[in-house]
């Protein structure tokens, strides 16, 4: 399967359940074209299908699972989409207690990856320094995870009257 965004990932999840198949990989479009030996199945992002999956997560697994999955998408965990799909399959099977099943490999991997993401984001909140370039405050980061969506609200509130950029 190929995916590009979180909605794209949720579209892949819908397709996996609808077709009763487990993909060998879920990859970004550019990566799938280069690494798939036997070809790839391109899954078009379908917002209606993605929304059906998104709405089903808190209903079946609870808000904690929804938050965990949304944050897991920002991690640098290898094959995160497959791990997320494994987590979701388990969650649909066992229900709201899924996040507490830390002995399950799917839950353990996702939980540890999200903890790593949150620790890294927390470090950037405390140690990120800005430099003035004209009227703009600029900070450069080199995160392992995609922490910017996690830390952005903090800096938007902190610098509400300032022009700033984090890259």
Label each residue range with its predicted role.
Residues 1-4:
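Conserved small/polar residues in nucleotide/adenosyl-binding loops
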Residues 6-12, 16:
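Short N-terminal binding/cap micro-motifs at the start of the first secondary-structure element
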Residues 19-167:
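Extended, well-ordered protein cores
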């Amino acid at each position: 399967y190929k995916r590009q965004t979180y909605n794209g990932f949720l579209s892949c999840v819908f397709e996996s359940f609808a077709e009763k198949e487990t993909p060998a990989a879920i990859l970004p479009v550019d990566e799938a074209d280069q690494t798939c030996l036997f070809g790839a199945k391109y899954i078009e992002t379908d917002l209606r299908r993605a929304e059906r999956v998104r709405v089903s997560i808190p209903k079946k697994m609870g808000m904690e699972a929804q938050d965990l999955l949304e944050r897991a998408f920002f991690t640098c965990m290898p094959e995160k989409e497959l791990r997320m799909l494994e987590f979701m399959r388990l969650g649909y099977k066992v229900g709201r207690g899924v996040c507490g099943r830390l002995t399950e490999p799917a839950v353990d991997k996702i939980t540890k990856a999200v903890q790593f993401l949150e620790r890294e984001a927390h470090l950037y909140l405390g140690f990120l320094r800005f430099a003035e370039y004209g009227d703009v405050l600029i900070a450069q980061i080199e995160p392992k995870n995609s922490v910017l969506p996690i830390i952005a609200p903090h800096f938007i509130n902190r610098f509400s009257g300032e022009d700033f950029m984090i890259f």
